[in-house]
């Protein structure tokens, strides 16, 4: 697949590594990756979309080839939304786009999908395994009071969030992973042995932990009411071992034009079932 690459400077002087794929005259898809991935994780899906769309991907700050901020607060959700704005203003200036995001890419993209300034440009948002932290906080409070079983079920899936708050544990642990070792873990989760290697896994894992530290406690303790400014599709992965599908049940509270589609897949379906994910993206946008 042909691609072009760019460097985009952010509002706080970081550098983001951006790629574009396909014919620039086609409708635009912006794909945002999660943790501990980089933009390469989207390539299997891109192969099924590139004939029909102009695709923009980028390494979020701290991942892949992009620069690594020194301070945790540089990973806060409002700054991540500004990063998306910097990318689209640079690569597709004044054009509208469809946003698709997975895992932490989706969590951070909710900040933009509920931001009024994107209303005229963001045509739709497809979220995969990444809830809005504000919505999740309201949901967990309600579940704790009314449905403790659901509350503790999600809590058991989110054990790693607490571990990532420890100052040195998570960065140190990632030093012991190699690309092949991480690939074996993904293969066990997804039931496939042909998944691509992430050659940046040590750095992506080590630095991306700041996403959790900068955002989870502030958002879960002081959630904001955030309403979507565009149609939203939630691709719900029924076998997801990290995000409970029940988190999606309350989404119509926050999204006026909402669509839900269930897929029998685990968390990294964008790698293990790219053709299915691409089909659902096409169907929605």
Model-derived features: positions:
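Hydrophobic residues on the short alpha-helix immediately C-terminal to a glycine-rich phosphate/catalytic loop
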Residues: 45, 112, 247, 280-284
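N-terminal cap/lid segment of alpha/beta-hydrolase-fold proteins
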Residues: 1-15
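Conserved HGGG/HGGXW glycine-rich cap/lid loop of the alpha/beta-hydrolase fold
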Residues: 19-65
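Residue-level recognition of beta-strand->loop/alpha-helix junctions
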Residues: 59, 262-264
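Hydrophobic "lid"/C-terminal helical patch
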Residues: 84, 88, 277, 281, ...
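Catalytic histidine-centered segment of alpha/beta-hydrolase-like enzymes
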Residues: 265-278
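The conserved beta1-alpha1 loop
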Residues: 30-34, 102, 236
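Flexible "cap/lid" subdomain of the alpha/beta-hydrolase fold that forms the substrate-access gate
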Residues: 14-16, 41, 56, 63-100, ...
């Amino acid at each position: 697949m042909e691609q072009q690459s760019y460097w985009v400077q952010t509002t706080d002087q970081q550098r983001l590594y951006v790629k574009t794929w396909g014919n620039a005259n086609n409708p635009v898809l912006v794909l945002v990756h999660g943790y501990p991935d980089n933009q390469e994780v989207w390539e299997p899906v891109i192969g099924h979309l590139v004939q029909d769309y102009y695709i923009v991907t980028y390494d979020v700050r701290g991942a892949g080839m992009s620069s690594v901020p020194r301070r945790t607060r540089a990973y806060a959700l409002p700054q991540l939304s500004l990063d998306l704005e910097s990318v689209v203003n640079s690569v597709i200036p004044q054009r509208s786009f469809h946003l698709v995001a997975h895992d932490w890419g989706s969590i951070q993209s909710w900040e933009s999908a509920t931001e009024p300034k994107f209303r005229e440009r963001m045509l739709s948002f497809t979220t995969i395994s990444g809830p809005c932290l504000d919505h999740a906080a309201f949901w967990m409070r309600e579940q704790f009071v009314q449905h403790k079983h659901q509350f503790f079920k999600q809590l058991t899936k989110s054990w790693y969030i607490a571990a990532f708050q420890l100052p040195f544990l998570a960065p140190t642990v990632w030093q012991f992973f190699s690309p092949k070792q991480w690939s074996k873990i993904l293969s066990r989760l997804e039931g496939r042995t042909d998944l691509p290697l992430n050659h940046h896994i040590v750095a992506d894992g080590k630095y991306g932990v700041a996403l959790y530290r900068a955002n989870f406690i502030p958002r879960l303790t002081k959630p904001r009411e955030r309403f979507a400014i565009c149609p939203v599709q939630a691709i719900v992965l029924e076998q997801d071992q990290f995000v409970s599908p029940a988190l999606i049940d309350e989404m119509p509270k926050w999204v006026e034009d909402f669509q839900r589609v269930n897929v029998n897949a685990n968390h990294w379906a964008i790698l293990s079932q790219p053709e299915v994910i691409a089909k659902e993206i096409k169907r929605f946008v």
